A protein has these predicted regions:
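Soluble or luminal CAZymes and related metallo-dependent hydrolases
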Residues: 35-39, 76, 125, 216, ...
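A generic structural signal for well-ordered alpha-helical segments
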Residues: 47-48, 110, 136, 170
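Catalytic core of membrane glycerolipid acyltransferases/transacylases, capturing the structured
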Residues: 18-23, 36, 65-123
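Short acidic-hydrophobic, aromatic-tinged amphipathic segments that line or gate anion-handling sites
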Residues: 57, 116-120, 209
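Structural motif
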Residues: 123-131
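Membrane-anchoring hydrophobic helices of lipid-metabolizing enzymes
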Residues: 1-69, 83
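Non-catalytic C-terminal accessory region of glycerolipid acyltransferases
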Residues: 130-246
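Positions that flank functional sites
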Residues: 63, 125, 185
Length: 246
């Protein structure tokens, strides 16, 4: 949290960017998806520079070249989605816990990419969001989903259990599933320190529909979970090349 406060105070002279983000988000008819996404990434770059944050991405070449897909990542903290967007050149959106999505800056980041807010305690609403994601992925949209449903504030690269229901949107869309392993992202805002921090994002080999069409959502969830856990372990051991191959 110290770094978050430091970033905010260090960018007070850019406070005008917050209402600007809100304006762009409210007028998608004027500002293209690409424009709004790049403005989000511009804000992320400013935050990284002030916050002394470096994010290295591996396996970017694994991302499908055409059409929509869903990235499923482990969840460590507030920086996770920003770390992915920082290295993901094509516009993508996010499905996020509604309760965490209205914090200052978080709201603006989510709105700019037309993110989906999911109520974890409302099954009917959650099912509706998954259906929306499915339809939009069919149209070529790309989404980030954190299938653990949330995160705990604790120091370490923990990978919390995944909720199989989170995979149903990708399954219905018959879309590629891209496992994403996030490493050391928790250090950005959970460490009470301003020392330079380096995080990693690993894009693993995607699972295409033909590979998982005969699998249940539970089995898909377990497989993605195991692959991400293996990648995180390799990364902690410093073997980044092996991590991408998981």
């Amino acid at each position: 949290m110290l770094r978050f406060i430091y970033v905010i105070l260090g960018n007070l002279h850019r406070i005008w960017m917050i209402p600007t983000m809100g304006y762009y988000a409210r007028h998608p008819e004027k500002y293209s998806e690409k424009f709004r996404y790049e403005y989000d990434r511009h804000c992320i770059t400013i935050m990284k520079k002030r916050g002394r944050i470096t994010t290295n991405a591996y396996g970017v070449g694994n991302l499908p070249k055409d059409g929509g897909y869903v990235m499923f990542a482990n969840h460590q903290g507030k920086y996770d989605a920003l770390g992915i967007m920082d290295s993901h050149n094509n516009p993508c959106s996010i499905v996020m816990d509604a309760d965490r999505s209205y914090m200052p800056l978080v709201k603006q980041f989510i709105d700019l990419v037309q993110g989906k807010r999911i109520k974890l305690d409302d099954l009917r609403q959650a099912a509706g969001i998954i259906s929306e994601v499915s339809e939009e992925v069919k149209q070529g949209w790309k989404f980030i989903i954190f299938p653990s449903g949330g995160y705990e504030h604790r120091n370490g690269n923990y990978v919390d259990p995944f909720k199989p229901g989170c995979f149903k949107g990708a399954i219905r869309a018959k879309a590629p599933i891209v496992p994403v392993a996030i490493v050391n992202s928790w250090k950005v805002f959970d460490l009470w320190s301003l020392r330079r921090v380096v995080t990693q994002v690993f894009y693993l080999k995607p699972m295409f529909y033909d590979e998982y069409k005969d699998m249940k959502s539970n089995a898909i969830s377990d497989l993605v979970y195991k692959r991400i856990c293996s990648a995180v372990r390799c990364a902690e051991e410093g073997d980044f090349k092996a991590a991408v191959l998981k």
